From Swiss-Prot:
Its EC number is 6.3.4.5. L-aspartate binds at T116, N120, D121. Keywords: Amino-acid biosynthesis, Arginine biosynthesis, ATP-binding, Cytoplasm, Ligase, Nucleotide-binding. It is found in: Cytoplasm. This is Argininosuccinate synthase. It comes from Thermus thermophilus (strain ATCC BAA-163 / DSM 7039 / HB27). Belongs to the argininosuccinate synthase family. Type 1 subfamily. It is an enzyme of class 6 (ligase). Homotetramer. CDD domains: ASS. GO terms for biological process: argininosuccinate metabolic process; L-arginine biosynthetic process; urea cycle. ATP binds at A6, Y7, S8, G9, G10, L11, D12, T13, S14, A33, G114. GO terms for cellular component: cytoplasm.
Length: 400
């Protein structure tokens, strides 16, 4: 039997690699995706080989991640439960897509992942796998093995000579990519406990951020960001640049309790500096370029799209149908937003667009601009008609 494992190089997937070989008598191919997590991918590849993988594949997927997953999601204005910009959720279908592809190329019968049986990631990985290859076998060791906790896993690692660099458990777990870093578990499981001050890796503490604000301009073309401060950049390079700018000023920290797809509530702390800047910049350009009813309709559909991404339905027909709508709307989003970054905050201070629907002569108090204010009287009376009828009926105590 041959299995392709999504391998990070950490404790869990290193143990899983050895466990798969022992339990299934299988040949294991390790796959590591570089999506901007900041870890040494080549080091993880070498570690996989030392741990017993017959082959280790490492791919740089940063551009594909941002171009084909993050940017389409951002065109939809997706935010889960009002705060979460979906940094972990959007990475899973990309990784699973390549897991399935490699399994097909290598003639493997199964894929495996290190997601636990309590979280969302198991669903995201497996829904993607079954959507792309319905007959694929998926192995989820966390749902099969008998380890009762980290101590038993560390003991297993030591007994099998697995090169785990640290045996001391961190007070929280962390997952990183080019869009964000997430923290959960351990000391963060108490929703009343403030996150440890030294936990954050991507952003400066807002209290210690520069005392002077920094301005940044983000240019959009047909829905996608294409330049920062006038410099055109590739999708991954653009997001990285904004991560650096936002991180310097403590932008993008979020601490929430969210509803997992599997039914439980979970506390998550996130850093999304570049994504937060892009969210505000996009809204600024959209305010000029989108018709009122289109914008309101888009905002009604965005939460459903975010839910689909969070749940793992990236390759589902309903997500694809919504994407077609959002992509059509985004074709009008061309322009520039100017923002001020200051001690954890993002302020929109300017916006412009070549096809702006904003007409200064119409809204100016100093110019008529072709708008007759007397027209408002009839408009208001028509809008008030149903309200007046309701009030009259209630006053009379009976209907017509």
């Amino acid at each position: 039997m041959k299995i392709v494992l999504a391998y990070s190089g950490g404790l869990d997937t290193s143990i899983i690699l050895k466990w798969l070989k022992e339990t299934y008598g299988a040949e294991v191919i390790a796959f590591t995706a570089d999506i901007g997590q900041g870890e040494e991918v080549e080091e993880a590849r070498e570690k996989a080989l030392r741990t017993g993988a017959s082959k280790a594949i490492a791919l740089d997927l940063k551009e594909e991640f941002v171009r084909d997953f993050v940017f389409p999601m951002m065109r939809a204005g997706a935010v889960y439960e009002g705060y979460y910009l979906l940094g972990t959720s959007i990475a899973r279908p990309l990784i699973a897509k390549h897991l399935v592809r490699i399994a097909e190329e290598e003639g493997a019968e199964a894929i495996a992942h290190g997601a636990t049986g309590k979280g969302n990631d198991q669903v995201r990985f497996e829904l993607t796998a079954y959507a792309l290859k319905p007959d694929i076998k998926v192995i989820a060791p966390w749902r099969e093995w008998s380890f009762q906790g980290r101590k038993e896993m560390i003991a297993y690692a030591e007994a099998h000579g697995i090169p785990v660099p640290v045996t001391q458990e961190k007070p929280y777990s962390m997952d990183a990519n080019l869009l964000h870093i997430s923290y959960e578990g351990g000391v963060l499981e108490d929703p009343w406990a403030e996150p440890p001050k030294g936990m954050f890796r991507m952003t400066q503490d807002p209290e210690e951020a520069p005392d002077a604000p920094e301005y940044v301009e983000v240019e959009f073309f047909e829905g996608d960001p294409v330049a920062v401060n006038g410099e055109r950049l590739s999708p991954a390079a653009l997001l990285q640049r904004l991560n650096e700018l936002g991180g310097r000023h403590g932008v993008g920290r979020v601490d929430i309790v969210e509803n997992r797809f599997v039914g439980m509530k979970s506390r998550g702390v996130y850093e999304t500096p570049g994504g937060t800047i892009l969210y505000h910049a996009r809204r600024a350009v959209e305010s000029l370029t989108l018709d009122r009813e289109v914008l309101h309709q888009r905002d009604m559909l965005s939460p459903k799209y975010a839910e689909l991404v969070y749940y793992g339905f990236w390759y589902a027909p309903e997500r694809e149908a919504l994407q077609a709508y959002f992509d059509h709307v985004a074709k009008n989003v061309t322009g520039v937003a100017r923002l001020k970054l200051y001690k954890g905050n993002v302020y929109v201070v300017g916006r412009k667009a070549p096809k702006s629907l904003y007409r200064q002569d119409l809204v100016s108090f100093d110019e008529a601009g072709g708008y007759d204010q007397k027209d408002a009287e009839g408009f208001i009376k028509i809008q008030a008609l149903r309200l007046r009828v309701r009030a009259l009926v209630e006053r009379e105590g009976h209907g017509a």
